[in-house]
Amino acid sequence: MELTEALVAEDITPFERERLREALEEEVSRQLPADRQLLRVVDWDPRGGHAVEDAPGKRKYTVAYETEPRD
């Protein structure tokens, strides 16, 4: 399992679990090196979901995820 930080649209609240998971999966996938693919987002820290000063309209989350090598 690995950890990263991800920014998602501020209009996605911590209570919209499926929508939030999809947004986190998209963001984490963009951050991965070309030789890795995302298996799943395991968990995220909702307390990290505050507005970010240098990214207006975004919330920052700490995300735990699993990857595997691309074929």
What feature does the model see in each segment?
Residues 4, 42, 64-66:
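A structural detector for beta-sheet-dominated domains
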Residues 1-33:
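N-terminal acidic leader/helix
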Residues 4-7, 21, 49, 53, ...:
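N-terminal cationic amphipathic segment used for targeting or macromolecule association
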